[in-house]
Amino acid sequence: KKMLEPDLVGKTFSRPIIYVKRAISGPIETYQNGVEGRKVTSLSRRGKYLLIHLDNQTKLLFHLRMEGKLFVVKKAPEENHLSLYLPFQGEEGGLAFFDTRKFGISYLLKEEDEGPLSKLGPEPSEIKDPNYLYRKYKRSSLPIKELLLDQSIMAGLGNIYANEVLFASSLSPFLPGKKLKKEDCAVLLKNAQKILEEAIEFNGSTIRTYH
């Protein structure tokens, strides 16, 4: 987000070019018509989604999945691994969505429409009481690694960060949720907050895929 923002805010998109149909949600023409001529007003992040807010109370949501990367480029790129290209109006260059695995997806939504965001739990920074995690985890026999990856409980941790959080907390990824003590949940939350905060600050492992 930080890397994209200076080069993207204030730009107006011309008609998107879609190379991989499943890279967008919904009809192609609806997406193209909705994005064409719209100006970027701001960017934000929610869980593992990047949000690009447009000037007509709509927003683009990008879920990059495992290999998706967003770049602002100076000229139209080669088609190799390109899923979606949003050219800038009146100038060369645009926003390029590269995805070697082709799992990433973009949504065009009204600003008030939560779409897939409605299924997300709070981010680590929004959780003030570790008992929230304790209550969620204590009824599950799933391994703690799987529970950390469950975005409906706590949003924002992917595979790499979940491993880092568990390592920092000295907890086995295979430990069932119901075996966690309250103190374990407090340590997990503290480390999740710290690791995600550092990742965002330094454009860390997964966040770096935004630039």
Spans of features found by a protein language model:
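Structured catalytic/nucleic-acid-binding cores of DNA maintenance enzymes
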Residues: 1-211
